[in-house]
């Protein structure tokens, strides 16, 4: 969903920059710059982004002070970077991203009061996961143009990258309020809600997406996972089963369903109580001592009698000592 929409935004950005005078920019001088821009737009629409960047470069050569050329070429470079990523060319993607950043920086230099330059620069930084720097660009753009919902949305992406869930919810909610058909904002807001453990709100957003498109298995699976986190395992299993009916080879969803099934079984199982081991009460202890005390007393008396007999036997037959005193 994100890649497709990003592609659309990129092409629209090219068209807008080419056809509209940028705030604070001087009108382009006459010459061949316009034809190169039109040719670049055509190539971009045909997804020949590197060739489009070359055409925009020719337009820049003809009119080096026109910020539109840098904006267009930066957009083409960025889209070429995305294409390189899809092809597994990380080095090529990095080179194109850096070229895009340089062009958008030049765009800002030539038109510092144009919010679009900061938005484009920030979006590129965000794709490079440099979220703090991207956030600064988006905030600057919104200072210049507070009602730009596209910038608000891009800022929401950066806030998700920084785990600023509450701020992301606020930004995506602002976008939805103005553009209720922006399904991507519902999806991202649901992620932020889920990360905040506001599972009911996340489930509501995923349910809205499913209502709009019942065949959206991605939203169905995400809702199932959210149900599982909320310990609503039966609902989670139903969503996972719906996904597996369409994509039976989805091993990840199958494993999640097995987990939900095991948790549901454990939740429904009635635990067998273990009988406690009784401990003697004070009364029982007293009765025990009552039984033991006479026994101890009897043993003691018998021992004394035996000692007395032994002493008597030992002293029998001995002469009693006589007194030497004359009587």
Predicted regions and their residues:
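Helix-start (N-cap) detector for alpha-helical repeat units in TPR-like alpha-solenoids
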Residues: 33-34, 67-68, 115-116, 149-150, ...
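Residue-level recognition of tetratricopeptide repeat
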Residues: 41, 75, 82, 123, ...
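Canonical positions in the second alpha-helix
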Residues: 58-59, 106-107, 140-141, 174-175, ...
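Cytoplasmic C-terminal tails of single-pass
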Residues: 317-327
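Register position in tetratricopeptide repeats
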Residues: 45-46, 79-82, 86, 127, ...
């Amino acid at each position: 969903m994100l890649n497709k929409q990003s592609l659309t935004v990129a092409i629209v950005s090219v068209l807008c920059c080419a056809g509209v005078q940028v705030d604070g920019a001087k009108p382009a001088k006459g010459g061949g710059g316009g034809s190169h821009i039109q040719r670049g737009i055509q190539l971009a629409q045909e997804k020949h982004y590197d060739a489009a960047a070359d055409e925009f470069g020719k337009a820049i050569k003809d009119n080096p002070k026109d910020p539109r050329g840098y904006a267009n070429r930066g957009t083409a470079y960025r889209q070429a970077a995305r294409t390189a990523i899809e092809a597994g060319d990380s080095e090529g993607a990095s080179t194109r991203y850096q070229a895009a950043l340089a062009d958008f920086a030049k765009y800002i230099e030539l038109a510092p009061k144009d919010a679009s330059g900061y938005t484009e620069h920030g979006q590129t930084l965000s794709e490079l996961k440099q979220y703090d720097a991207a956030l600064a660009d988006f905030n600057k753009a919104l200072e210049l143009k507070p009602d730009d919902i596209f910038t608000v949305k891009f800022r929401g992406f950066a806030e998700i990258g920084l785990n600023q869930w509450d701020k992301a919810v606020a930004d995506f909610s602002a976008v939805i309020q103005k553009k209720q058909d922006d399904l991507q904002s519902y999806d991202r807001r649901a992620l932020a809600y889920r990360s905040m453990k506001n599972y009911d709100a996340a489930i509501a957003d995923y349910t809205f997406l499913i209502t709009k498109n019942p065949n959206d298995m991605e939203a169905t699976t995400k809702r199932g996972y959210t149900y599982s986190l909320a310990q609503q395992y039966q609902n989670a299993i139903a969503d996972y089963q719906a996904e597996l009916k369409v994509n039976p080879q989805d091993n990840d969803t199958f494993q999640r369903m097995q987990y939900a099934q095991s948790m549901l079984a454990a939740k429904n199982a009635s635990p067998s109580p273990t009988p406690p081991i009784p401990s003697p009460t004070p009364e029982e202890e007293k009765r025990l001592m009552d039984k033991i005390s006479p026994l101890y007393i009897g043993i003691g008396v018998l021992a004394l009698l035996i000692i007395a007999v032994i002493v008597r036997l030992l002293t029998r037959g001995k002469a009693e000592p006589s007194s030497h005193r004359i009587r």
